[in-house]
Design a protein with these regions (language model features):
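C-terminal-of-GTPase-core extension/linker across diverse P-loop GTPases
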Residues: 1-166
Length: 166
């Protein structure tokens, strides 16, 4: 089944294998069984709609469960140069951008890799930590230091919106 699919030029990920079938081919470490984040760099005129090449890419990978980010790298490079947030916001408004494509790229990457972020806050610093989605607090604490998981006592948790509100 996999061989035929590959010979047709298709990625294994689009085959929709069962867990049993996936474990049977796991030792092969097939790259086409991995999710892919495609990034299409388009010209400024196509930054909101894409172009024929990005449309063809989207069409080609639509059944794979992968994602395509369409962006204009020249504009993104200019956005990255701004130090003043107001200037950055004005520039983005001029191009009718809600957020930089780099932010979408980061969010899509986290989603694709099944990652999440949690924050720790102390007197001197606030820090972001990357963890796998679904981890419990003790596992998340192990990212800071392995001993933290072993001696874990409690976590004070607050939703982001509540944190901003209160």
């Amino acid at each position: 089944q996999c061989k035929k699919h590959l010979e047709e030029g298709k990625n294994i990920i689009s085959l929709g294998l069962s867990k049993e079938d996936k474990s049977a081919i796991a030792d092969l470490f097939l790259l086409t069984d991995k999710h892919i984040l495609y990034v299409a760099n388009v010209d400024e005129a196509s930054m909101h709609t894409g172009n024929k090449y990005s449309a063809a890419l989207i069409e080609a990978v639509k059944n794979e469960g992968n994602e395509v980010i369409v962006m204009t790298n020249a504009i993104e490079a200019q956005i990255a140069e701004f130090e003043n947030p107001e200037d950055k916001a004005m520039f983005m408004e001029e191009y009718k951008m809600v957020e930089p494509a780099l932010d979408r790229l980061i969010h899509s990457t986290y989603k694709l890799l099944n990652l999440s972020t949690y924050f720790t806050a102390g007197v001197q610093e606030v820090r972001a930590w990357t963890i796998e989605k679904g981890w419990k607090a003790p596992q998340a604490a192990s990212v800071i230091h392995t001993d933290f998981e072993k001696g874990f006592i409690k976590a004070e948790v607050i939703a982001y919106d509540d944190f901003l509100k209160y």
